[in-house]
Amino acid sequence: MNYLGFDIGGTKCAAVLGNREGRVLCREAFPTEGPDATLEKLFQAAESFSERACAAGVSCGGPLDEASGVILSPPNLPGWDRVEIVRKIRERLGIPVWLCNDANACALAEWRFGAGRGTRSMVFLTFGTGMGAGLILDGRLYSGACGNAGEIGHLRMERLGPVGYGKAGSFEGFASGGGIAQLARAAALEQFQQGKFTAYCRTPADLDSVTDKSTAQAAEAGDPT
C-alpha cells in the first residue's frame, strides 16, 4: 500500500508518494503561496503520481486543530486562517486524511525509519522558516493536552535579540532560518557602521536580500562575520 504525504511549510511545500517501508516513490516541491493556490498544486502533484494512495497525511506548523483537521493561523503562513485542509483534501481525492504538526510528523518518521530507530524516547528539532520540536516519550508521541508540547520556539533565551513569532530573544528568533537571517543583517549593519562590509552583504542596499541560505554559504566560504 502507498500513502500520500503533504508538507506545508512557510517557504515551500511538497507532495510525496511513499510506501509502508518509508521509501519515497515520487516527490514534487514548490514555493508556498496562499491556501487555494497551494492546495491546487498539491492536488495536481498527487494526481500526477503513477500509483494511487490509500490515505494521506498532512504536516504543517502550528497552531492546528488536529482533531477537526483545521490549520488555524500559523505565524509563518500568513493568510492560512482556519483552513479546513482535511475536508478539502478528502473531498478532492476521496481518501482518508490526517493532519499532524510538522515537528511531530518528523519525530514519528525519524523514530520509525531514521536515527531514532530502537529508542524509547527522543526529541526531534525542526529548523526551517520557524522552529519546533517533536517528542517521543517511552515509545509514544507526546503532543500534550492541546497539541503544543513541542512548541519550544517560544522559549525566551535572551531579553533582547532577533524576533521569532513576535517574541524578541526567543529560541525561534535565534535558531530558525528567519532568525539566522535577522542576525546576519544585524551583523552586516554593524560592519557598515564601522566602514566595513561582509562577503554576503556588500552594501546597505543589499540588507533586505540577506537570507539564511546566503548566510550559510558565506559561513561555509569562511566569512568571519
Descriptions of predicted regions:
Residues 19-20, 26, 59-62, 66-67:
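Short, conserved active-site loops that position catalytic residues or coordinate cofactors/metal ions
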Residues 7, 102, 128:
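Active-site glycine-centered loops adjacent to acidic/histidine catalytic or metal-binding residues
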